[in-house]
Amino acid sequence: MFRGNFETSIDAKGRTSLPAKFREVLVDSFGDERFFMTNSNPVRLGDGGYSSGLVIYPYNEWLALEEKLKVGTGLGLSSAELASVKRRIVAPAVECVADKLGRILVPPHLRKSACLEREILFVGMLNKAEIWSQAEWEKVFRQDIENFPIDSPVLAELGL
């Protein structure tokens, strides 16, 4: 499973290094070094704006998601909502594999949608990982703390 946060940088051409730990997880836990990268679901911020990062799906996890979206039944979505999800998540998706040095290329359309410029953060989310600009991550993380304070019943229910 993907765990932890890893700070790194991305250059002007969109090259960055996939954390070694995440490369290990792809192969050891998911059996494939390939993955898909796409837009994450936007997070609504308290000021009414939105923040968005990218999400990395292990290859087989992505194929399972595509199958659900292809069938479309049982998801509780209207055909318009399903089409919207496909446009936001499936259409911009790219298949990736790190090179021998662990580098990946984040294409321009994904860098733009996630506001990735220089300092970025890889975030482990168990069966997937996220990529955030440092600035956007700080906004989202601050909101998470406000939404789930230390005495939150949600956290207590999870035993945290």
From Swiss-Prot:
Q: Which family does it belong to?
A: Belongs to the MraZ family.
Sorted UniProt keywords: Cytoplasm, DNA-binding, Repeat, Transcription, Transcription regulation
Subunit note: Forms oligomers.
Which InterPro entries is this protein grouped with? MraZ (IPR003444), MraZ_C (IPR035644), MraZ_dom (IPR020603), MraZ_N (IPR035642), MraZ_sf (IPR038619), SpoVT-AbrB_dom (IPR007159), SpoVT-AbrB_sf (IPR037914)
Q: May I have one GO cellular component term?
A: nucleoid
Q: Which GO terms describe its molecular function?
A: DNA-binding transcription factor activity; transcription cis-regulatory region binding
Task: Return the protein name.
Answer: Transcriptional regulator MraZ
Species of origin: Geotalea daltonii (strain DSM 22248 / JCM 15807 / FRC-32)
Q: What is its main location?
A: cytoplasm
Q: Where in the cell is it found?
A: Cytoplasm, Nucleoid
> Which segments constitute the SpoVT-AbrB domain?
5-50, 93-136
Q: Name one Pfam family in it.
A: MraZ
Q: What is an annotated GO biological process for this record, any one? A: negative regulation of DNA-templated transcription initiation
